[in-house]
């Protein structure tokens, strides 16, 4: 005779997962409407839907269409993509390092991107003068340099940590810490050599912002982050096996070295594109995956897509707070994520310490 309680026990996790993903989808929608509707010109959700459905063709909606389609909608979409990319990267790094307190910055993307951006901000115009070229530098050079700097830094760490075809995540972690310190020192030298305008630009870049978001930025960021979001769930099975250890995962048929390379590459692309689009934003990649582990467990095939949803919603919500706290001015979004993320990180660290003590 079949045990009905067995079927119910199997169904309960599925119901929980469906409820969590439905809740996250609703959260993303609600936060997006909030972001598009709140600002110097408040716009009701009904008018937002009218503008989106009519594409700005109705003259009565001309002002709202201008605000929504040209300013707030690209900003919201960019925030969703960058937040999703950072959170998914954090989940990948935590799975790869088998440490729930790991962060995407461990592979050097943020350090390399930040240093490259600082070089362009401080030295870009001087290099043009030195070579007798007309200036100023096009703005597109800055995010392009940040993206390339992040990829180069990650490639350097990968080469340092790889010997005889095997990549040591411990070596990569230590090399990443060294790279972060070196990058910080070199950025400090650039800050010392900068003028007032460059110093403001450096400060704003290092703390992150979604200000100035355009459809051009969205179009440049989407081809980098969206393929990563599509690809990462396929790494879920391998990351689940990697929790047992590299040798055990290999004996289970997981191509461990290929998995490491894929995870590092995807993190480099997603974080590099995010830093290029919005500057350096911390704690999203750390807090979101760890929080979701408490809600839906460590199964990466669920954790990775859930991280994308919650990461996007969290960053857009932080952007809303950054716009409102000192309106009509705007806080760098990195300040908001740090103010929220740092206490949460300490709480997670203390909770983990208590668990290990038990």
State each model region's role.
Residues 2-358:
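Alpha-helical transmembrane segments in inner-membrane proteins
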């Amino acid at each position: 005779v079949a045990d009905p309680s067995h079927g119910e026990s199997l169904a309960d996790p599925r119901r929980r997962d469906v409820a969590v993903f439905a809740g996250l989808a609703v959260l993303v929608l609600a936060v997006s409407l909030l972001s598009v509707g709140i600002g110097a010109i408040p716009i009701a959700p009904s008018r937002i839907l009218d503008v989106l459905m009519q594409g700005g063709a109705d003259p009565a909606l001309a002002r709202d269409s201008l605000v929504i389609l040209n300013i707030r909608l690209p900003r919201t979409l960019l925030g969703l993509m960058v937040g999703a990319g950072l959170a998914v990267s954090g989940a990948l790094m935590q799975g790869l390092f088998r440490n729930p307190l790991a962060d995407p910055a461990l592979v050097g993307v943020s350090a390399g991107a930040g240093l490259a951006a600082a070089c362009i901000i401080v030295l870009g115009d001087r290099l043009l003068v030195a070579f007798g070229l007309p200036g100023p530098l096009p703005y597109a050079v800055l995010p392009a340099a940040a993206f390339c700097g992040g990829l180069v830094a990650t490639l350097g760490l990968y080469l340092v940590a790889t010997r005889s075809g095997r990549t040591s995540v411990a070596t990569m972690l230590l090399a990443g810490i060294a790279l972060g310190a070196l990058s910080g020192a070199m950025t400090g030298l650039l800050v010392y050599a900068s003028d007032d305008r460059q110093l403001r630009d450096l400060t704003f870049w290092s703390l992150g912002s979604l200000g100035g978001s355009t459809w051009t930025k969205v179009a440049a960021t989407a081809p980098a982050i969206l393929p990563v979001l599509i690809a990462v769930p396929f790494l879920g099975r391998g990351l689940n096996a990697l929790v047992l250890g590299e040798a055990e995962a290999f004996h289970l048929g997981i191509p461990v070295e290929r998995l490491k390379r894929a995870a590092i590459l995807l993190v480099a692309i997603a974080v590099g594109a995010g830093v290029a689009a919005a500057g350096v934003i911390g704690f999203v990649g750390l807090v979101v995956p760890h929080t979701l582990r408490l809600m839906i467990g460590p199964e990466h095939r669920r954790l990775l897509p859930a991280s994308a949803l919650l990461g996007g919603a969290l960053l857009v919500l932080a952007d809303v707070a950054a716009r409102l706290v000192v309106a009509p001015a705007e806080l760098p979004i990195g300040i908001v994520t740090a103010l929220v993320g740092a206490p949460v990180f300490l709480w997670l660290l203390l909770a983990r310490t208590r668990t290990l003590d038990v």
